[in-house]
UniProtKB/Swiss-Prot annotation:
GO terms for molecular function: RNA binding. The gene is smpB. This is SsrA-binding protein. Pfam families: SmpB. It is found in: Cytoplasm. The keyword RNA-binding applies. It comes from Thermosipho africanus (strain TCF52B). Required for rescue of stalled ribosomes mediated by trans-translation. Binds to transfer-messenger RNA (tmRNA), required for stable association of tmRNA with ribosomes. tmRNA and SmpB together mimic tRNA shape, replacing the anticodon stem-loop with SmpB. tmRNA is encoded by the ssrA gene; the 2 termini fold to resemble tRNA(Ala) and it encodes a 'tag peptide', a short internal open reading frame. During trans-translation Ala-aminoacylated tmRNA acts like a tRNA, entering the A-site of stalled ribosomes, displacing the stalled mRNA. InterPro entries: SmpB, SsrA-bd_prot, SsrA-bd_prot_CS. SUPFAM superfamilies: Small protein B (SmpB) (SSF74982). The keyword RNA-binding applies. Keywords: Cytoplasm, RNA-binding. GO terms for biological process: trans-translation.
Amino acid sequence: MKVIATNKKAYSDYNILETYEAGIELRGTEVKALRESGANFKDSFCRIKNGEVFLLNLNIPQYRNGNLNNHDPERPRRLLLHKKEIHRLIGKVKEQGLTIIPTKIYFNSRGLVKVEIAVAKGKKKYDKREDIKKREINRKINEYLKRNR
């Protein structure tokens, strides 16, 4: 598995509850651009329309050696999931007020582009502060243990 890009902001802004692996419908130049320069997750999210899941605002830069048929960098991209998974996502988003965000995009062992999406709940400001405090405490404990070995 070769990771192309990760959404680092997702882990600090959301509590990740479940993750799913989804295929993504891409054009030829998009795959070449992913191999060449990666992707940008800034402000990207998933939306469900007519029983299909779409990934919005994922920026895949244009392929340098492309021609007139080069792709639009921020076009909506359809995610490929099983129908049961889509129904489960619809239920969670509608009933519990959760959101679907992309966390990682990568090439699997067969060379196909996959997106890891997560069902997540947004963190409040005080939740973020608690996470920072926990991280600092763990860092201090580890530092103390290293010094006293």
